[in-house]
Regions:
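Feature of Fe-S/electron-transfer and energy-metabolism proteins
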Residues: 1-295
Length: 295
């Protein structure tokens, strides 16, 4: 009999709600009962009112249960958790949850589906396809595709990403940098944290493509120190990507170089502003620079 796949998020919000305790209780109870279970720690779908959210793989799809406490595990197993059976904590198929059913997720497309540090999972769900295609294009062509797509940043008043990339590509300079501002200083805003913890390879791939487009060979991910889990996940992801050849002196055997480094922020709100962030990355006090020039 093959092991049943059970997914419990490793996202810091889920962990704060008791996900680690639920995972330990499930493993212990299943071992005691002789039940074959493959426990997978996935990213979070962002349904924090249901965390810890336990998902069970069935023939029909993933069935959701939540919020689950460690003390609920014996009763859930008695009720047929591993078969996706009905229970008071059950919500049916995850994709049919009202909050998710009408969504078309783009940046969060893999959230809750893949394991954050699994290169195989990432590639199986479309990962690295964009980078491989970008390596077949000229830098000008990459920028033009971004312009034609109308891609805009999630912050920065929806400034067109292609315009920013084109400006950097055309700027003179022997050394250019790509910087990800993940300081996320606005209270209650956790979309950056979810991306860093839940889909770090997506960020790595995007920054590498940006580096190819503008001629940058070095990148920094600036993460606030209040996000220790995000720092840890991102650091591990960079190491794995480098080991697999997606970062380093010869990206995917293309001859192009791009390296990434995590820099921890001190938690100053002002460092969410781009020039203050650059000051901080350079080891200086995080204060806003006079403009121009603009970074």
């Amino acid at each position: 009999m093959s092991a049943v796949q059970v997914f419990i998020p490793c996202d810091s919000a889920a962990v704060a709600c008791g996900a680690n305790e639920v995972a330990a209780a499930l493993q212990a109870e299943c071992a005691q009962r002789g039940l074959a279970v493959e426990l997978l720690r996935n990213s979070s779908r962002g349904l924090f009112w249901l965390e810890p959210l336990v998902e069970v793989q069935t023939a029909a799809g993933r069935v959701a249960y939540g919020p689950v406490a460690a003390a609920d595990i014996p009763a859930l197993l008695d009720a047929g958790l591993l078969q996706g059976a009905p229970h008071a904590l059950g919500h049916g198929l995850v994709e049919q949850l009202p909050y998710l059913a009408k969504q078309e997720r783009l940046t969060f497309a893999r959230m809750g589906i893949t394991r954050p540090l699994s290169l195989a999972d990432y590639e199986a769900h479309g990962g690295w396809a964009g980078l491989r295609r970008a390596l077949q294009l000229t830098p000008v062509a990459i920028v033009q595709e971004v312009l034609d797509a109308g891609l805009r940043g999630r912050g920065g008043a929806a400034f067109p990403a292609g315009v920013k990339w084109r400006t950097v590509a055309q700027a003179a300079g022997t050394q250019k940098y790509i910087v990800c501002n993940a300081d996320e200083g606005d209270s209650g805003t956790f979309s950056d944290r979810m991306t860093l913890e839940g889909d770090p390879f997506m960020l790595i791939e995007g920054m590498t493509i940006a580096g190819l487009a503008v001629g940058a060979t070095q990148g920094y991910v600036y993460i606030r120190s209040e996000y220790p889990d995000a720092v840890a996940v991102m650091t591990q992801a960079i190491a794995l990507a480098k080991q697999a050849g997606f970062l380093g002196s010869d990206v995917c055997g293309s001859g192009h170089a791009f390296t990434l480094e995590v820099r921890k922020a001190a938690g100053a709100y002002v460092c969410g502003e781009e020039t203050a962030m650059l000051e901080s990355i350079e080891g200086k006090r995080g204060i806003v620079r006079a403009k121009p020039p603009l970074p």
